[in-house]
C-alpha cells in the first residue's frame, strides 16, 4: 500500500505542477496576444497547451504567431477573421525556412481551390491551406486531391458547400 500511495502522490503532485505551469503559460500567452485576436480566447489556450508540450516559451510563441500573421500582408493572404491567426499558429510550430516556403504555397493552394469553388473559397480556408503548404506538395496536386475528395464526398450523398469543402481539405491530408 505504501508504494501505491507514493505513486498516487507523484501523479497528483505532477498533475498539480503541470496545471500550474499551464495556467501560468496561458496568462503569459494572453498578455502577449492582442485582445481582439482569435488567440485571446479559449482557442489560444489549446495553442498554449501544444506549445508547452513542445517546450516553447508562451510569450515568445505569441510573438512568433503575430510576426507570421504580419507576413500574410506581404503575400496578400487573408488577414481578417477567425482562421488567419489559427493558420499563423499552425505555421509557428514549424521552422523559419518551412514558414518561408509555406507562404507562397498557401497563396497558390488558395488560388487552386478558388478555381474549382470561387464562391466557397475564402479566408476560412487559410488554416487548411497552411496545413497542406507545410507538407510541400505542389498547389496543383493539392487542388486536384481536394477536388477529388470533394466530388467523392458529394457522390456519397453529402451536400455541396463550405462544410463539404472543409471536409475534403482535411480528408486530403491523409
Predicted regions and their residues:
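Residue-level detector of solvent-exposed, low-hydrophobicity positions
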Residues: 43, 68, 82-84, 89, ...
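Hydrophobic core segments within long, regular secondary-structure runs in both alpha-
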Residues: 22-30, 62-70, 100-114, 143-151
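Periodically patterned hydrophobic/aromatic "hotspot" residues that form packing/interaction faces
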Residues: 5-9, 48-52, 87-90, 128-133, ...
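Short helix-capping/linker segments at secondary-structure and domain boundaries
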Residues: 12-18, 54-62, 92-100, 135-143, ...
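A contiguous, surface-oriented mixed alpha/beta subdomain in the mid-to-C-terminal portion of proteins
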Residues: 96-100, 109-174
Amino acid at each position: 500500500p505504501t508504494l501505491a500511495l507514493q505513486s498516487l502522490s507523484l501523479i497528483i503532485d505532477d498533475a498539480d505542477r503541470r496545471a500550474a505551469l499551464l495556467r501560468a503559460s496561458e496568462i503569459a500567452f494572453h498578455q502577449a496576444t492582442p485582445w481582439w485576436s482569435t488567440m485571446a480566447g479559449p482557442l489560444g489556450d489549446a495553442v498554449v497547451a501544444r506549445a508547452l508540450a513542445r517546450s516553447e516559451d508562451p510569450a515568445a510563441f505569441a510573438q512568433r504567431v503575430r510576426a507570421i500573421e504580419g507576413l500574410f500582408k506581404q503575400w496578400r493572404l487573408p488577414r481578417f477573421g477567425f482562421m488567419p491567426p489559427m493558420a499563423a499558429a499552425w505555421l509557428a510550430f514549424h521552422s523559419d525556412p518551412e514558414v518561408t516556403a509555406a507562404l507562397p504555397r498557401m497563396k497558390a493552394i488558395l488560388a487552386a481551390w478558388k478555381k474549382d469553388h470561387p464562391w466557397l473559397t475564402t479566408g476560412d480556408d487559410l488554416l487548411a491551406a497552411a496545413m497542406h503548404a507545410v507538407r510541400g506538395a505542389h498547389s496543383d496536386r493539392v487542388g486536384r486531391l481536394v477536388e477529388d475528395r470533394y466530388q467523392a464526398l458529394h457522390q456519397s450523398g453529402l451536400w455541396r458547400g463550405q462544410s463539404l469543402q472543409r471536409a475534403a481539405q482535411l480528408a486530403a491530408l491523409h
